[in-house]
Amino acid sequence: MRHRSAKLLALLLCILLACSVLGGCAQAEQQKYSTSFFDVFDTVTTIIGYADSQETFDRVVGEARQQFVRYHQVFDGYNAYDGVHNLYYVNQNAASGPVPAEPELMTLLAWIRDLQPSLEGRVNVAMGAVLRLWHDAREAGVALPDEAALREAAGHVDMSQVILDEQAGTVYFADPELSLDLGAVAKGYTAERVAQWMLGSEMPSFIISAGGNVRCGQKPLDGRDRWGISIQDPGPADGLPGTGYMDVLYLTNLS
């Protein structure tokens, strides 16, 4: 009996030693992978992550990209998509009566509505009528929109005129001249939603860069405790010596 126990103990020690040499049996070595895609929110989206294999990385990023595409279509105010009651659909129809909206759009609009008292006018997604004039002027190569048209549009930017029925999943514009524009929030909100999903995935160590919106997951698995994010001024500015950057932020699980 003692001889058998000794042999079993020796076998267990050999297994533990082998696991130590190989870096652990339960967890494969994590490698750094990255990819970029260009088809959402009119910008380049890059995801860097640490995964146990290329297959794991591709699987997680594939799902993350599908989520980006979905949010892009739902929050798009310029294009229609078959079967999608997105922002464009709402802007085109909500002045005539309550219209259905995708669940993701309802959630975002309700969140923005509830934040209005604390925002104090700093962010107003109901400025679509004003922003449309600037968009049209830019597309036409005009330096400035018509001032009278801007003043008229500025009278139709009251978020309280956006009536949400969360139970029915509908949106109604009490002001028929009002229009929504999600450009101030859509990319950052989407990056956060995707990041929350990725934190529970097989690859919780990641960083997402989506057109100036950067979201870090758990710390990088290369010995560092934080991700380094360089800040660059698009115009001429004095930066850190020898880098061209204004500053570097070191973050973990933050935007």
Which residues fall in each region the model found?
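Mature catalytic core of soluble alpha/beta enzymes
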Residues: 2-255
